[in-house]
Design a protein with these regions (language model features):
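Structural signal for hydrophobic packing residues in well-ordered secondary-structure cores
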Residues: 25, 31-34, 79-90, 102-106, ...
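Active-site diphosphate/adenylate-binding microenvironment
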Residues: 2, 99-175, 181
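Short, flexible loop/turn segments with low-complexity composition
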Residues: 89-101, 300-303
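Phosphate/diphosphate-binding loops
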Residues: 10-60
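Terminal amphipathic helices with adjacent charged low-complexity linkers/tails
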Residues: 54, 61-96
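Generic enzyme active-site microenvironment
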Residues: 53, 134, 187-188
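Glycine-rich, N-terminal phosphate-binding loop of Rossmann-like dinucleotide-binding domains
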Residues: 30-31, 74, 137, 302
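Thiamine diphosphate
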Residues: 5, 11-12, 18, 23, ...
């Protein structure tokens, strides 16, 4: 929410952030690895910039991107020391340009009549002034980083570029044990949740009141998004409605889901749960979950598989090559 914050950078970065890095003349990078999800096409990343890279790991310096000023140091110590040398300068013209980019392509999602991810994030922002949000891996991870307002008291934990599906629930368990009394919300997809759902037993045993949100679109959503945008809608092994006889006719009404009933499964572990299908039921569901002081609580949200993550940089593209919608 800081006025100078302009959003995520990279493959699912905000338009303004990607344009700012592409057009800047000086780039301070603190603790990043410059992985491919951040840079896009390497030789066109920040083409006009002198790059200052602060990292405590010597091996990360100039590994992917050549940097002009390498600084091997603890980030906090380096920033504190550098702040002593900062002088005021006029950035009005540059900030005006950034504001133009922000207004040109603000982050947005389609408004769904029943419910969409943005409705859920709006409730989280409104209802939880203090919380720890832990995400799994997939579309919900990117959407959370885009639409949940991160503040001093509302923190976000994710596994970054490691791609560790199944991280959400055990990550939330660790966060709750380390921060008793603080609301901990894990956000997972129906695919990632099933990779470590057995850890509900641990959460019940340790009496951890985690709120576990499942964005259930009956798909491995991020992979499906790639198949839709870049592989001619040839959906393979991503639809969790598909059986052995499926011939890829996505949307067949008679095709049954191959995911469990998450609410009954939660109850079988001794946890609690509720299924939400309408936006007016989101806020009451979170209020009910907050009443559970010693028991994990699952909220399953039924999500449209066409709720995709935008913007998106084309594979092999530059930060300028953003798909804004399709």
């Amino acid at each position: 929410k800081h006025p100078l914050f302009i959003g995520n950078l990279g493959m699912h970065g905000a338009y303004a952030a990607n344009m700012a890095v592409t057009n800047c003349d000086l780039l301070f990078s603190i603790g990043t690895r410059f992985n491919d999800r951040i840079t896009g096409k390497l030789h066109e990343f920040a083409p006009n910039a002198q790059i200052v890279h602060i990292d405590i790991d010597t091996a990360s310096i100039s590994r992917n991107i050549h940097v002009d000023v390498p600084i091997v140091a603890d980030a906090k110590e380096a920033i504190t020391k550098m702040a002593e040398y900062v002088t005021e300068c006029n950035t009005k013209k540059w900030r005006t340009e950034i504001d133009i980019w922000k207004n040109e392509h603000p982050l947005s999602m389609k408004n769904r009549p029943l419910m969409g991810p943005l409705d859920i994030f709006n409730v989280i922002n409104k209802q939880f002034d203090k919380a720890i949000i832990v995400t799994d891996v997939g579309q919900h991870q990117m959407l959370t980083s885009q639409f949940v307002d991160i503040t001093e008291n509302r923190k976000l934990i994710m596994s970054g570029g490691l791609g560790t599906m199944g991280y959400g629930l055990p990550g939330a368990i660790g966060a709750q044990i380390g921060n008793p009394g603080v609301p901990v919300i894990s956000i997972s997809g129906d695919g990632g949740m099933q990779m470590n759902i057995q850890e509900l037993a641990t959460a019940v045993l340790e009496e951890l009141p985690i709120i576990s949100c499942i964005f259930n679109n009956n798909n491995l959503g991020m992979v499906r998004q790639w198949q839709k945008l870049f592989y001619g809608k040839r959906y393979s092994m991503t639809c969790l409605h598909s059986g052995a006889a499926c011939r890829g006719k996505c949307g067949e009404v008679e095709c049954p889901p191959y995911t469990p009933d998450f609410i009954r499964l939660a109850e079988s572990y001794g946890a609690k749960g509720i299924r939400v299908t309408k936006k007016e039921d989101i806020e009451p569901a979170f209020r009910e979950a907050m009443k559970s002081k010693k028991t994990p609580y699952i909220i399953e949200f039924e999500i449209d598989p066409e709720d995709l993550v935008y913007p998106m940089v084309e594979p092999g593209g530059t930060l300028r090559d953003l798909i804004m919608d399709c």
